[in-house]
Amino acid sequence: MFAKPTTRIVYLTAFALVISVLETLASESGFVPVGVGGYATIPPQGTRLPQSVIYKSDNLKKRLPTNKWWSSLAWDRFSNNMYPHPLAVRAMPEGLRVYYPGNNITASANAIMGSMPGGYADFVVGLSLVERFESAVVDDFGDWSVSALFRTNSTTMRANIVMGSPFVTFTFNGGIPAIRFANANAPKIIAGDEKSATLIVAIGNRYYGLFAPAGSKWNGIGSTVLTADTNGKNYFSVAVLPDNSAETLSLFQKYAHTHITNTVVQWVYDQEKCIVRTRFLFETKRYEGSEDAVIFALYPHQWLNTKTKLTDNTYNSVRGTMKVAIGREFTTEMVYPGVLPVLPVVKDANTDLMTTLIEREIKNQPRIVGDTYWLGKQLGKWTSLSQISAECGKDDMRNIFAGRIKMALENFFTPTNRTGSLKTSRDGVFYYDTNWGTLIGYPASYGSDDQLNDHHFHYGYFIRAAGEIVRQEPDWGRDEKWGGMVKMLIRDIANPDRSDAMFPFLRNLDVYAGHSWASGTARFADGNNNESSSEAVNAWYGIIMFGAATGNDEIRDLGIFLLTTEIEAINHYWFDVTEQFHPKDYRASVVTMVWGGKGVNETWFSNNPEMVHGINFLPFTPCSLYLGRYPEYCEKNYRALLGEKKAFLEKRGRKIGEQFKDSELWEAWTDITLMYHALSNPEDAFSQFSERLPGLNAEAGNSLANAYAWITMLKEFGAVERSITANHPFYAVFRKGNTLTYIAYNYKREPVKVKFSDNTELTVPPKSYRILQNQSKKR
């Protein structure tokens, strides 16, 4: 049922081998050719680079990922706070600090707080012979786990930390385990004594198990430092317990000395059933006892989509209730929502107006060089405009935008200037950093260079634009042309091949948390973060589009896995569409920024509600229909935005009377706001858009033509119908009253028959889409 990604992604292995050979020739030229383009291997003049020091052990030979919940461990001598829920941990000079935030989560109107406080609470696990370790480094890692090696001279302690595990397991060399408690008072011992291998301690409303090997004895009971005489054995475990019952103690004791040594994810897109099936495996080593299985806790997006048997035990987290299971693996099945590469311009649209709006964009001076984020947004705008132009029958206009896209991409994909010299950091170039195993685009922005932030946000625009060019001009995407460099970008942000010598496995997606992380370093007290969930989706959408356009199902299915996983997390942790997981005291309609230790209704850059909400809407592409899968939530979210905007303006001295029109409120991202509003009320969105159109300016990565096409399409077709799926990757279904509209796109050179889950069938012509409306369907 499952194939390992390393065996499925054949295209990367062969492509990486070619690049490896070429790299050996790059020392003199300073660049590696890839097709007709290439990348620099010498830092371009004027660049900022990531720090040279990576805190890893000599044991670690594979490519180290960035943008993980544990990334600060690799960037600093000791880590910042890390949040492998249900626990929070921190590598400190004294050892590994352990804390359970779940019983102290608080919520206000605009924040859900579950961070680890300052100091040493609840306790620090170290060694008796070591007052302060010299460093803590990455010794190994799995797909959602990390091993931290604490060392001082020949004395070492290795901590295995796994997201979802209530345990942290240790092995050590030199000394014996020492647990130092933060409070002035000794911890309350509620089970065990100095002669038992296991102690259960209470710290406030939190319960922990301290599991020493069989035959161990404890010293220091009654004090704030406990040491375990481990009877000559070198392993040890601690765990946060769901409660202090005898049954729970017995259960955790049974699995306490089975250590998780590796974590592995596998996935498959089941096209016929329209689901993504993801398998999570725990590799273990049994130090004592008879159990090879482990105890683990599932996040809501996991337990909602698994058939794995769950126990009655639970933990609290800032993402909601985590439910406990026991085993060596579990599987989730998530519905793939479907995407389309292009949307139709509907018959009710005013094509003369559309043409005028497109012409306005043509007159704007094109920006061919810029930093990878803002140029990327420009590429996204041109991509949509090229599609709309073609849909309007304006091939000449389509060619103008396609020409701009190719010019910008080809410039960035070419490492030398016209004289053959290497480009500077101002000229548009990709540089491969061998130390960190990453491709950095220059000009950079928002720490995409020295901190490796946001690569999925930036490069996603490039990949989607390339996918659209290849859809229309297949030859452009061949490896011998420009497709090889597009694959380099894909490998940087979402490499599915663990054996790749150049790039780490799945840089940006956290496969267990279910969503991306934006910070390359995670050097924050609240852990890592991800703000623009929609720009993450845009990256995965781009991978699907490029894979489909090049006829590479492996790339396409990689994108489908990433997109399906991310959207499921967005619906629960950003939007809480089922109203189950945001605390009742959190009154905002959305978490706009997810952190390891909190969720907040704010952005890095603005307090304007249009932007606070809109950063999780943009860019609007054909893929953005996923935002409308819960139209009732869209209406709730829009109404919340409306109220926030009125309050925002009133604080700035603007009086909002009862006769004030909604359309008059918007001053920043009007087009983005109304495109979102159209997902639940397209008639009102169209009315507001029409009122504002004469003097309206679009958000930088959008166009009024795109907004008009989107709103008029939803006005004609209605809301997204999520209950109907298809046995084909490229589909959408809408409902307006009792009329269902089915759309499917066919990338192939021959007709394809698409079957929807309600038994509707559609034969789609080659390289095109087909629309079917059926008025006989009723709810």
Residue spans for each PLM region:
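Sec/Tat signal peptide C-region and signal peptidase I cleavage site
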Residues: 21-26
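Alpha-helix capping and helix-loop boundary segments enriched in small/acidic/polar residues
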Residues: 373, 449-453, 457, 477-481, ...
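Polybasic, positively charged surfaces/segments
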Residues: 539
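Bacterial N-terminal signal peptides
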Residues: 11-20
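Ser/Thr/Asn(+Pro)-rich, low-complexity disordered segments
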Residues: 27-456, 486, 496-515, 519, ...
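Bacterial N-terminal signal peptides that target proteins for export
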Residues: 2-11
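Inter-helical turn/loop segments and adjacent helix faces that build the functional surface
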Residues: 389-396, 469-480, 543-557
